């Protein structure tokens, strides 16, 4: 009977996989018949320690973990895909799902202990606070002063076009939900965003969907710098880079900080397992320091007191740039700045 159920599960999974652009996938077998289906934007090498820790306390529960882009995740949940838990760094898209009725409420002692700014109506829960950073190639910047503000970065790029031609990476915000969130929030916070975008646009910038690939391309020498990537991913890559090829910079004028969030989709079946994983994540999220975990907890912004951190608030204001007219206007301005060739 169990084999028949597993066979049916695999058939259903195969049809689901064919409908999604999956970046990675892994099945963590438990000793029982229950399966927790997780859809997430977090790379496996970053999130695997959390899944292993959770499964050690829930050994009978199997975990089916699927990695997709934030926009794929949003579409999957909105279309009723059979996932029990959705974890995303694109907090605006997560909030939109919760606001539009695609999330199920969850209440526990762990979620009740979260500050008000880290949860909304028992539907969406933040468990990390992750800054956007600049990752640069130490070789490509040899002989140059390292920028500490966007204006200094503008000056360096403008004064050395031959060094940075085709070697600047950033998000393609048309496809990346996280990239769009970073861009819109930064544009609201500082006029320097558009000045920097225009200078990048003259240098034939390379556009990406994800932080991980940008960081790898800096480490491999294909890029001189990657702009607005997740600091947690950059720190993980830096820890594995023994050659000193990569350096992380936080802009001192302003640094966006996103909250990675969790929701239980309204289509979820394994709500008990989903709630238990949320509880573990939010408990870890209330630590004072990262410790041995890859992702930084809520409220932790590192040790550099010179950096002006600007946390993006969890609330209805997140949906302003998701309005179709606002989105189209922003993307038009972004394309004019970044695609000048």
Region locations from a protein language model:
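Short beta-strand->loop
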Residues: 103-112, 123-126, 239-256, 265-267
């Amino acid at each position: 009977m169990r084999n028949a159920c597993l066979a049916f599960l695999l058939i259903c999974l195969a049809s689901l996989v064919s409908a999604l652009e999956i970046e990675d996938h892994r099945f963590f077998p438990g000793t029982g018949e229950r399966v927790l289906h997780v859809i997430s934007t977090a790379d496996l090498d970053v999130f695997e320690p959390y899944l292993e820790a959770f499964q050690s306390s829930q050994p009978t529960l199997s975990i089916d973990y699927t990695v997709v882009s934030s926009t794929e995740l949003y579409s999957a949940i909105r279309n009723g895909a059979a996932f029990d838990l959705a974890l995303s760094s694109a907090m605006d898209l997560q909030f939109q799902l919760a606001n539009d009725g695609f999330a199920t409420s969850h209440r526990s002692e762990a979620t009740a202990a979260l500050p008000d700014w880290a949860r909304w109506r028992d539907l969406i829960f933040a468990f990390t606070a992750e800054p956007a950073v600049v990752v640069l190639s130490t070789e490509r910047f040899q002989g140059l002063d390292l920028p500490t503000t966007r204006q200094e970065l503008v000056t360096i790029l403008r004064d050395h076009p031959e060094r940075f031609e085709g070697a600047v990476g950033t998000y393609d915000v048309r496809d990346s939900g996280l990239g769009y969130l970073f861009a819109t929030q930064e544009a609201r916070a500082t006029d320097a965003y558009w000045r920097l975008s225009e200078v990048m646009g003259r240098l034939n910038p390379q556009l990406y969907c994800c932080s991980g690939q940008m960081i790898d391309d800096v480490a491999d020498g294909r890029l001189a710098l990657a702009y607005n990537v997740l600091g947690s991913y950059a720190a993980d890559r830096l820890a594995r880079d023994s050659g000193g090829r990569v350096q992380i910079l936080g802009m001192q004028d302003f640094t966006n900080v996103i909250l990675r969030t969790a929701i239980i989709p309204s289509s979820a079946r394994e709500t008990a397992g989903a709630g238990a994983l949320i509880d573990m994540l939010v408990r870890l999220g209330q630590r004072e320091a990262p410790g041995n975990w890859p992702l930084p907890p809520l409220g932790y912004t590192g040790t550099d007191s010179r950096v002006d951190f600007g946390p993006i608030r969890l609330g209805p204001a997140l949906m302003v740039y998701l309005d179709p007219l606002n989105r189209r206007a922003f993307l038009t301005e972004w394309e004019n700045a970044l695609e000048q060739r």
